[in-house]
């Protein structure tokens, strides 16, 4: 029985999602330390996030990420212990370190490894970890190796967290020879590596980072998970680099009690959990197991998991992957498919087939931030032959509802509010009930059908045998058919037909009631399905705070770079957008914010001269407007001068000198390709790329972007986006023999027209006069090469908005307004101009959805 291969995608996907969440926590809290450097809660939260990221990445063999995060963690440990003070320079250094962590994660997501040299950055971080050597040596003076180093509470906690059930900690205090032999230079690291091969080194004094710095240390204390004191002594006795050493058992609980005034709750060391000898196998599994084990050993490994670990929902998968490196996982409880679910399990039992030792397994699973307790049992294979599965031994694996699930921004995973899931499940339950109603109705309709068949057969038989029956009746009565035939026939037919009409009436009434019930049930099921569909779509919705929160760091860094003081305000962060829109909105908003920082806001000196406050303000604002989301990026800067825009456009040849444009139209020409008013090129602006890309990106999302500005007061970028790209409201239109959908959020108005209402200019360009406004006319039959229906006297004109202008689309008829589920077009049709996707109608017909922003491009191509 082979357990599912869970390597890679499922586990890594959840890890990257959680890792991104941890990075966001780190970034947000590190920046908050600038304003409140002594906030212990913030420092603790940063330390926990770094500690978790370090441990989780190590368990997945991402050592470049784990090792570097370990250094960052140690810096915060020093901050937490009051050994390091926070200032702006340290915050800058920590944020730079966080950028490296982000790069490491990004490369791992792409299947690559970070290889850049960051030794300078590591050295800067380690400057905060160095302990003065003289102080260190004086602490040892006294000629007695029993004069132990003082352990802080955080040191003891680190040791305590690393322990499993029944494990011992040995303290190995080593004094090194102080000769000048180069072999001794890194003697502390040599001993560390020797001890690491024996067990798990939980802690060292001084810390590991100082040990590896290639400087001579007189003494180092190592805290090792290992039970064989004599084995340790044997490994150290023959080493010339050691002057003396002492190995003794270290009682963590007693040391903690010395530091605390109250009794320490002994949750880790005195658990009442013990592995029993009952096995969780069926008879068939035992047979398979005995065949697979052969000359190997079977270990039963139980792991209890840390509940407050942000990555608690993948702990079971993490440990499964770790144990697989030692052998074959025959079975896990819960099984691998359950471990893939995004939920927390208090504990998991693994059955490992391997030739390894219990010590090796302990080293592999000893991750304090993941595992709170563990026990390893070497199973007696002979006992398996008589074991049967016992129902009372099955442990309840329940999801821990106290685990907090934060919304991530990263790989293609979505966290869903449990209330939304509960609502969906209720709707599904209603759908199941309605399905039962349908089954009942179906059964009744079948019965009714058989009744009709019986009635039909009866009437047919009656008509066929009527005369025969009549002759028999007459013969029995001693009558001749000719004498009384008319009266008897009338009497008999009257009786039969009266009964038949009564039966038909009852059947008709039954069928009518059935149809009424069917109609009511159909309506109820339709409502449930609609609600279910909408609820599923809501699970894709994420708050826009997922994007807005990123700009705190952006504004901070750019403020320093541009020597400006900027306050960032956010409004409507709870506004929700479809995840697919969220993912593609980051870059456009980034361009707009950078533009406001670089071009919009003045320097401190310029603002003071204009009578403004020294600090400029940027507001990120989001709000719902029906089926559309409105996003605004507002600044209180210098504003945009339409005269400057006009002059630049004339210089570039984009517009003619005699061209007439309103101020609003001129300002919105900043989205023209290659447009820039920057005097010099910098790494932020001046290259003429950016805002045209922003416009294209927004239009790709089926949205619009406009700019409003007033000289001296500021500028507002206004973006309108559909709530979701999955479902849209649209007009179903017909042109020739083809049917299309035009997104309703682009439609301004519709008109019924004749061909005489459309005018032709000298350049063969068709236009329509809409309340004294001349707008361009596009015909779908021309654009998509459809045979035109010239028999129609009247047609329809649909006026649509394309960001900064209106166009009119001519169609033969408007079939109606509906909601449409958008399906992407793949392969050779994916780049079709003028088409944004496809949808399926209720009758099964597939129709294309028009991309109104690309229709002009399609018309140019058609003319050429």
From Swiss-Prot:
Q: Does the keyword Calcium apply?
A: no
Give UniProt keywords alphabetically. ATP-binding, Chemotaxis, Cytoplasm, Kinase, Nucleotide-binding, Phosphoprotein, Transferase, Two-component regulatory system
Gene Ontology BP annotations: chemotaxis
Q: Which residues carry this modification: Phosphohistidine?
A: 51
Q: Which GO terms describe its cellular component?
A: cytoplasm
Which SMART domains does this chain map to?
CheW, H-kinase_dim, HATPase_c, HPT
- Subcellular location, principal: cytoplasm
Gene3D superfamilies, per this entry?
Histidine kinase CheA-like, homodimeric domain (1.10.287.560), Histidine kinase CheA-like, P2 response regulator-binding domain (3.30.70.1110), Histidine kinase-like ATPase, C-terminal domain (3.30.565.10), HPT domain (1.20.120.160), SH3 Domains (2.30.30.40)
Q: Where is the CheW-like domain?
A: 727-864
Enzyme nomenclature, EC number: 2.7.13.3
Name where it's found: Cytoplasm
Known Pfam families for this protein? CheW (PF01584), H-kinase_dim (PF02895), HATPase_c (PF02518), Hpt (PF01627), P2 (PF07194)
Protein biosynthesis as a keyword of this entry, yes or no, is: no
| Domain (Histidine kinase) ranges | 480-725
Name the reaction it catalyses: ATP + protein L-histidine = ADP + protein N-phospho-L-histidine
Q: Which GO terms describe its molecular function?
A: ATP binding; phosphorelay sensor kinase activity
Q: Which positions fall inside the HPt domain?
A: 1-108
The record describes the protein's role as:
Involved in the transmission of sensory signals from the chemoreceptors to the flagellar motors. CheA is autophosphorylated; it can transfer its phosphate group to either CheB or CheY.
Question: What name has this protein been given in UniProt?
Answer: Chemotaxis protein CheA
Q: Give the taxonomic lineage as stored in the record.
A: Bacteria, Pseudomonadati, Spirochaetota, Spirochaetia, Spirochaetales
């Amino acid at each position: 029985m082979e357990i599912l291969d869970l390597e890679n995608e499922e586990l890594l996907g959840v890890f990257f999602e959680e890792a991104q969440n941890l990075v966001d926590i780190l970034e947000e809290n590190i920046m908050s330390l600038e304003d409140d450097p002594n906030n212990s809660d913030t420092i603790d939260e940063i330390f926990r996030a770094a500690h978790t990221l370090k441990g989780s990445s190590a368990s997945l063999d991402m050592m470049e990420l784990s090792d570097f995060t370990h250094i960052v963690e140690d810096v915060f440990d020093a901050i937490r212990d009051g050994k390091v003070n926070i200032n702006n320079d340290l915050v800058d250094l920590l944020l730079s370190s966080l950028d490296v962590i982000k790069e490491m994660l990004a490369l791992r997501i792409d299947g690559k490894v970070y290889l850049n040299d960051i030794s300078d950055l590591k050295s800067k971080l380690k400057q905060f970890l160095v302990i003065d050597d003289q102080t260190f040596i004086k602490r040892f003076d006294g000629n007695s190796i029993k004069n132990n180093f003082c352990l802080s509470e955080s040191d003891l906690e680190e040791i305590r967290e690393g322990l499993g059930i029944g494990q011992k900690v040995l303290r190995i205090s080593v004094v090194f020879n102080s000769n000048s032999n180069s072999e001794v230079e890194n003697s502390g690291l040599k001993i560390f590596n020797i001890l690491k091969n024996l067990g798990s080194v939980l802690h060292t004094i001084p810390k590991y980072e100082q040990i590896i710095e290639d400087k001579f240390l007189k003494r180092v204390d190592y805290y090792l998970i290992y039970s064989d004191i004599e084995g340790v002594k044997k490994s150290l006795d023959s080493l010339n680099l050691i002057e003396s050493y002492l190995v003794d058992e270290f009682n963590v609980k007693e040391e903690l009690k010395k530091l605390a005034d109250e009794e320490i709750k002994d949750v880790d060391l005195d658990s009442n959990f013990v592995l029993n000898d009952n096995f969780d196998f069926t008879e068939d599994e035992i047979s398979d197991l005995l065949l697979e084990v052969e000359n190997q050993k079977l270990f039963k490994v139980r792991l209890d998991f840390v509940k407050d670990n942000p990555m608690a929902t993948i702990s079971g998968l993490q440990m499964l992957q770790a144990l697989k490196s030692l052998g074959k996982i025959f079975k896990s409880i819960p099984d691998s498919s359950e471990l893939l679910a995004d939920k927390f399990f208090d504990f998991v039992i693994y059955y490992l087939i391997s030739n390894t030792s219990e010590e090796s397994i302990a080293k592999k699973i000893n991750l304090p931030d993941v595992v709170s307790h563990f026990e390893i049992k070497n199973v007696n294979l002979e006992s398996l032959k008589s074991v049967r599965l016992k129902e009372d031994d099955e442990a309840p694996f329940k999801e821990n509802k106290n685990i907090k699930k934060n919304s991530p921004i990263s790989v293609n995973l979505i966290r869903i509010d449990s209330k939304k899931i509960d609502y969906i499940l209720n709707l599904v339950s209603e759908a199941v009930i309605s399905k039962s109603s349908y089954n009942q109705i179906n059964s009744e309709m079948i019965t009714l059908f058989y009744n009709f068949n019986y009635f039909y057969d009866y009437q047919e038989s009656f008509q066929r045998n009527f005369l025969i029956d009549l002759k028999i009746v007459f013969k029995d009565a001693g009558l001749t058919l000719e004498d009384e035939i008319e009266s008897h026939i009338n009497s008999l037919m009257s009786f039969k037909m009266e009964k038949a009409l009564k039966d038909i009436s009852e059947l008709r009434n039954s069928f009518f009631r059935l149809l009424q019930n069917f109609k009511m049930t159909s309506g109820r099921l339709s409502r449930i399905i609609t609600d279910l569909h909408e609820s599923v779509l809501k699970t894709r919705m994420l708050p826009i705070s997922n994007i807005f929160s990123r700009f705190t760091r952006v504004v901070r860094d750019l403020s320093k770079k541009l020597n400006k003081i900027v306050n960032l305000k956010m409004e409507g962060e709870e506004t929700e957008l479809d995840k697919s829109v969220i993912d593609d909105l980051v870059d456009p908003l980034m361009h707009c914010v950078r533009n406001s920082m670089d071009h919009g806001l003045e320097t401190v000196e310029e603002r003071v001269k204009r009578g403004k406050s020294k600090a400029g303000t940027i507001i990120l604002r989001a709000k719902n407007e029906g089926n559309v989301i409105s996003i605004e990026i507002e600044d209180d800067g210098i504003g945009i001068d339409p005269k400057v825009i006009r002059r630049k456009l004339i210089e570039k040849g984009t517009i003619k000198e005699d061209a007439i444009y309103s101020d609003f139209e001129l300002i919105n020409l900043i989205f023209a390709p290659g447009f820039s008013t920057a005097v010099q090129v910098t790494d932020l602006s001046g290259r003429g790329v950016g805002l045209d890309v922003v416009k294209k990106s927004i239009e790709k999302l089926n949205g619009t972007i406009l700019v409003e500005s007033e000289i001296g007061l500021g500028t507002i970028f206004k973006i309108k986006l559909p709530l979701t790209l999955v479902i849209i409201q649209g007009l179903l239109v017909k042109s020739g023999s083809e049917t299309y959908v035009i997104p309703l959020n682009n439609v301004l108005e519709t008109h019924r027209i004749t061909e005489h209402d459309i005018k032709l200019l000298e350049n063969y360009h068709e236009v329509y006069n809409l309340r004294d406004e001349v707008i361009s006319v596009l015909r779908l039959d021309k654009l998509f090469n459809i045979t035109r229906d010239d028999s129609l006297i009247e047609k329809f004109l649909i006026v649509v908005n394309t960001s900064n202008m209106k166009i009119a689309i001519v169609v033969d008829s408007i079939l109606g307004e509906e909601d449409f589920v958008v399906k992407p077009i793949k392969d050779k049709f994916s780049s079709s101009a003028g088409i944004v996707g496809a949808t399926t109608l209720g009758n099964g017909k597939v129709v294309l959805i028009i991309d109104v922003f690309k229709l002009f491009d399609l018309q140019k191509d058609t003319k050429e």
